[in-house]
């Protein structure tokens, strides 16, 4: 049993293969407290860790210091306005304009299943191995039920958390904050790790000490964003990739979020994660229910690397639903950086004809095929084919591509509307806008109000018609701007604070319909590159475009930060042109291919115009993809070295689950003069197996796994920046 309640000790034990998460009930089963989370411990009395036997004591023993108790008690879900001055997990506004709320324990349930979250992405359990603890809590004054959900995925060392809130009073109440998880523990010299960025440099790792007060990252942009990521970890300062204790939370959501650590006056840490409370409110009428999105929580006693592999396995096994989850994805070529808006059927077929000869398996037609769109100023929302560009329409183009033995895919941006469009002329009220205020344009477009079912239905029918008109097997779903001017003509004044969350729910509903109606469709999400690369999107699409920056060297740090928590199979990665269109850098074609191999792998350039020697490498690269993709897609990822840290080289590897095969990628970013070969210690191998290095220059390139991990392998020192090397080891 993963979950056990000890009636005598009032302790809930949530156990995974390597961890224990202990919850305690205090003061005659009134308060739900956090006792312990970390390495798995034997079943014993841990109640002393709640410190209820020392001042200020529990309220039943010392009512005069109830406030002090609230302000120090390690709560599993903190109330608001009654004495705990740390960050609250929930806040309300009543009809009387008051804000106090304090859920206390009522009862519990343990169930052998993983409940779904209505309208939200969430982890699933197809093998029926997970268990769920539901702690029923209530604020008796407000008649507000607050149910805390904990699902234990034992083999993944993962716990998911979410909250169900139900209003049983006769009056409506407004939620002004509803976090998904709260975790209190003593500080132990922890540092905080988050991911920051911008367009073209997403998910850069940032590790820093935790000072007193609140340290947070978040987004109020209507999506998870380029700038911050809905993830945080905290660890001892001595923790590395291979050693040390690491705690991590990841939000399975695609909208506004906050991830925060707070160090208190007594050196305790409070970690919270959930929907960002800025501009948020949700009206709960009598007997209505609100579900918070889910948080994935893990602990590793073996450094960041084990944390990474916990997330990778968990998302592959329990979050990605697509039929492509365990399948090799087709090698695609996207025409965006090849042509931008300047294309027609002839140009696309020229690219496809050559691509088909080189082993590329799908042509993806990007932005510019619809309405009268020849630049970014027009036609979003007008989802009909521009037959001036594509004479004969999609049917002719797709048929011709299929005749070449290739699949066909298409780009769409369903959430957006151009002021210069037929749709906007017909329905200007469909854009998110504040009445009387001039809308804020971004990329010459507004955002459609996806909180409205009539808007979603109209757009969905347009998408469905396009996808049904030809043999389209892939969709790139883009979102090229963030939300501003938050206002909906369909929501009353006291529900305007619901817009951002309802918008995200609308996107989820659209993608749920799409994947249901077109179950064989390969969906790739995108948002101006990687602005909506989050677990919520991963639930609907098995891969997400990692960044619009396709430069191989820039991609090293982008893909490092992404692979910290996401499986390599989820990262959209392409070989692109040089000089690179974002940074102007020239890198070897070989390096571009080998860096893109640590992702979905594809091409984004006009292969009819590149040098002959580069064209000749494409069949080698497509063969490389087919040879190694099963290993890359399913194996365990190990970060060996980071160019971000050493400013010299980058190295990572993937090891098969049975440890009989490994692929090492090494990139020399900056060559150095007068150096010996570099010794690199590998990870994750079986120390008792011998490994043959495929393609080794010596006759007998066989090394023990223990030797490769402890003594290391040698990488030659050669002239030239941006050189890459692949080393394939197979158990002998």
Each PLM stretch: what is its role?
Residues 5, 10-13, 21, 31-262, ...:
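Polysaccharide-binding surfaces and accessory modules of carbohydrate-active proteins
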Residues 18, 163, 287, 333, ...:
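Conserved, mostly hydrophobic/aromatic
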Residues 71-74, 79-109, 114-116, 243-256, ...:
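Glycine-rich, aromatic-flanked loop segments that form ligand/cofactor-binding clefts
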Residues 100-105, 282-301, 722-729:
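Short Pro-Gly-centered flexible turn/kink motifs
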Residues 232, 241, 644-686:
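Carbohydrate-binding surface patches
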Residues 324-461, 474:
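Aromatic-lined carbohydrate-binding/catalytic grooves of carbohydrate-active enzymes
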Residues 391-393, 425-427, 431-590, 600, ...:
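Active-site neighborhood of glycoside hydrolase catalytic domains
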Residues 670-732:
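C-terminal beta-sandwich/jelly-roll accessory domains of carbohydrate-active enzymes
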């Amino acid at each position: 049993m993963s979950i056990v309640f000890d009636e005598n000790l009032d302790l809930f034990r949530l156990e995974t293969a390597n961890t224990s998460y202990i919850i305690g009930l205090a003061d005659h089963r009134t308060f739900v407290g956090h006792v312990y989370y970390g390495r798995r411990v034997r079943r014993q009395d841990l109640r002393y860790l709640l410190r209820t036997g020392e001042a200020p004591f529990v309220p039943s023993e010392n009512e005069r210091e109830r406030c002090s108790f609230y302000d120090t008690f390690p709560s599993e879900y903190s109330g608001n306005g009654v004495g705990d001055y740390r960050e609250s997990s929930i806040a309300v506004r009543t009809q009387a304009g008051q804000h106090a709320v304090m859920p206390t324990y009522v009862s519990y349930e343990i169930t052998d299943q993983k409940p779904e979250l209505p309208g939200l992405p969430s982890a699933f359990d197809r093998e029926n191995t997970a268990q769920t603890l539901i702690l029923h809590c209530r604020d008796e004054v407000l008649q507000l039920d607050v149910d805390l959900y904990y699902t234990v995925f034992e083999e993944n060392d993962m716990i998911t958390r979410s909250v169900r809130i139900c209003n049983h009073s006769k009056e409506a109440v407004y939620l002004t904050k509803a976090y998904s998880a709260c975790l209190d523990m003593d500080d132990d010299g922890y540092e905080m790790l988050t991911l920051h960025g911008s367009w073209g440099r997403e998910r850069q790792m940032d590790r820093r000490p935790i000072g007193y007060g609140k340290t947070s990252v978040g987004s109020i942009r209507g999506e998870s964003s380029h700038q911050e990521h809905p993830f945080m970890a905290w660890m001892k300062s001595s923790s590395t990739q291979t050693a040390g204790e690491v705690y991590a939370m990841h939000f399975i959501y695609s909208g506004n979020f906050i991830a925060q650590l707070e160090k208190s006056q007594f050196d305790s840490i409070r970690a919270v994660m959930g929907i960002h409370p800025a501009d948020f409110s949700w009206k709960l009428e009598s007997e209505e229910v609100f579900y918070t999105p889910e948080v994935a929580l893990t602990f590793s006693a073996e450094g960041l690397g084990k944390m990474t592999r916990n997330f990778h396995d968990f998302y592959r096994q329990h979050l990605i639903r697509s039929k492509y989850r365990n399948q090799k994805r087709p090698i695609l070529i996207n025409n965006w950086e090849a042509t931008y808006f300047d294309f027609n059927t002839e140009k696309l077929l020229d690219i496809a004809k050559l691509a088909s000869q080189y082993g590329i398996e799908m042509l993806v037609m990007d932005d510019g095929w619809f309405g009268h769109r020849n630049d970014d100023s027009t036609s979003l929302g007008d989802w009909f084919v521009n037959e001036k560009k594509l004479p004969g329409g999609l049917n002719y183009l797709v048929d011709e591509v299929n005749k070449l033995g290739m699949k066909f895919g298409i780009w769409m941006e369903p959430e957006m509307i151009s002021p210069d469009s037929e749709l906007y002329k017909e329905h200007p009220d469909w854009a998110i806008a504040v009445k009387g205020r001039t809308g804020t344009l971004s990329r010459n477009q507004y955002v459609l109000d996806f909180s409205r079912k009539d808007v979603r239905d109209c757009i969905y029918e347009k998408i469905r018609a396009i996808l049904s008109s030809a043999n389209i097997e892939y969709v790139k779903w883009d979102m090229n701007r963030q939300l501003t001017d938050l206002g909906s003509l369909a929501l009353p004044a006291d529900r305007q604070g619901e817009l951002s969350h309802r918008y995200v729910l609308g996107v989820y509903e659209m993608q749920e319909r799409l994947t249901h109606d077109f179950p064989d469709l390969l969906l790739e999400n995108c948002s101006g590159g990687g602005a909506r690369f989050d677990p919520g999107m991963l639930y609907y699409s098995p891969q997400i475009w990692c960044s619009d920056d396709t430069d191989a060297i820039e991609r090293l740090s982008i893909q490092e930060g992404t692979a910290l928590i996401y499986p390599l199979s989820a990262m959209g990665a392409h070989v692109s042109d040089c000089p690179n269109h974002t940074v102007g850098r020239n890198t070897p074609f070989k390096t571009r291919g080998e860096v893109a191999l640590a992702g979905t792998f594809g091409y984004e350039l006009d292969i009819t115009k590149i040098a002959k020697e580069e064209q000749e490498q494409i069949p080698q690269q497509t063969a490389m993809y087919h040879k190694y993709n099963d290993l890359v897609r399913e194996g365990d990822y190990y970060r060996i070295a980071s160019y971000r840290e050493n400013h010299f080289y980058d190295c990572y590897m993937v090891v098969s689950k049975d440890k009989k095969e490994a692929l090492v990628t090494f990139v020399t970013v900056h060559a150095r003069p007068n150096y010996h070969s570099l010794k690199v210690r590998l990870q994750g191998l079986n120390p008792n197996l011998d490994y043959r290095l495929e393609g080794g220059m010596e006759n007998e390139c066989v090394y023990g796994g223990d030797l490769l991990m402890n003594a290391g392998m040698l990488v030659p020192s050669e002239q030239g920046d941006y050189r890459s090397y692949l080393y394939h080891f197979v158990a002998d």
